[in-house]
Structure formats: structure tokens, C-alpha cells
Amino acid sequence: MIKVKLVRSLICCNPTQRATVAALGLRKVGSEKTFKDDAAIRGMINKVKHLIEVSE
């Protein structure tokens, strides 16, 4: 399982990055979600890795 936490604001981001964060289910700074470790989630994490914090 992967725990993802949003640590930076989406103000400076382009619409694609905002959509990726929304698809991960993260709304406010500090919100967390847990996911199964699969290729789709890893790809989404790699697109917005500068905005989130990942722990396994």
C-alpha cells in the first residue's frame, strides 16, 4: 500500500497536474489517501511528485 499526502498548493500548476491530483482524490493541502501499489497509481504519482509526499 502507498500513502500519498498533498504538501504543496495547486495554485502554480497547469490544468493537467491539477486534474491528476484531483484524480488521486486529494483536495486540500495536508489531505492523505492510501492506494494499492500498481502501475497506474505510480504513473500519476510521477507526474505530480513535486507536489506530494509518498510513503510506503
Curated annotation (Swiss-Prot):
GO terms for biological process: translation. InterPro entries: Ribo_uL30_ferredoxin-like_sf, Ribosomal_uL30_bac-type, Ribosomal_uL30_ferredoxin-like. One of its GO terms (molecular function) is structural constituent of ribosome. It holds the Pfam family Ribosomal_L30. NCBIfam families: rpmD_bact. Belongs to the universal ribosomal protein uL30 family. This is Large ribosomal subunit protein uL30. It comes from Nitratidesulfovibrio vulgaris (strain ATCC 29579 / DSM 644 / CCUG 34227 / NCIMB 8303 / VKM B-1760 / Hildenborough) (Desulfovibrio vulgaris). The gene is rpmD.
